[in-house]
C-alpha cells in the first residue's frame, strides 16, 4: 500500500478556512490555527445571533407600538387588549410600521381599540 501524503487535502482544507476568514484583521486571516479558531467563534456568534435577532426585532416593534399608542392616550397592553377584543388581528411588525410611517391609520386603530375596551 503506497504512502499517502496529504499535501493536496491539507491545502484544500486550509484554503476553505482562509476563504471563510477573508476580511479578518491581523493573524486571524493568514495563520491557519488562529483563523480556524476565529471562524469557529464567528460561527457560534452567527448561530446565537440568528435567534437573538428574532427577539430583538419583537422588542423593537413593541417599543414602537407603545410609543404610538401612548401618543394617542393608551398604553401598549391596553391597546393590544383592545385590538384583541375588537377582533383585529394585525401582527406587531405591521402595527409598528403603521405607528412609524402611517400615524393616521394607527390612530384609527387606537380609536377602535378604545371603543372595544369601553364596550
Swiss-Prot record:
The keyword Ribosomal protein applies. One of its GO terms (cellular component) is ribonucleoprotein complex. This is Large ribosomal subunit protein bL20. SUPFAM superfamilies: Ribosomal protein L20 (SSF74731). Pfam families: Ribosomal_L20. Binds directly to 23S ribosomal RNA and is necessary for the in vitro assembly process of the 50S ribosomal subunit. It is not involved in the protein synthesizing functions of that subunit. InterPro entries: Ribosomal_bL20 (IPR005813), RIBOSOMAL_L20_CS (IPR049946), Ribosomal_protein_bL20_C (IPR035566). The keyword RNA-binding applies. One of its GO terms (molecular function) is rRNA binding. One of its GO terms (biological process) is translation. Belongs to the bacterial ribosomal protein bL20 family. Keywords: Ribonucleoprotein, Ribosomal protein, RNA-binding, rRNA-binding.
Amino acid at each position: 500500500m503506497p504512502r499517502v501524503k496529504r499535501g493536496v487535502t491539507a491545502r484544500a482544507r486550509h484554503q476553505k478556512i482562509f476563504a471563510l476568514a477573508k476580511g479578518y484583521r491581523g493573524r486571524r486571516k493568514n495563520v491557519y490555527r488562529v483563523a480556524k479558531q476565529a471562524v469557529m467563534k464567528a460561527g457560534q456568534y452567527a448561530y446565537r445571533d440568528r435567534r437573538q435577532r428574532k427577539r430583538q426585532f419583537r422588542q423593537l416593534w413593541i417599543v414602537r407600538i407603545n410609543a404610538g399608542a401612548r401618543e394617542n392616550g393608551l398604553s401598549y397592553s391596553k391597546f393590544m387588549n383592545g385590538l384583541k377584543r375588537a377582533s383585529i388581528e394585525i401582527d406587531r411588525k405591521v402595527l409598528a410600521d403603521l405607528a412609524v410611517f402611517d400615524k393616521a391609520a394607527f390612530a384609527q386603530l387606537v380609536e377602535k381599540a378604545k371603543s372595544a375596551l369601553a364596550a
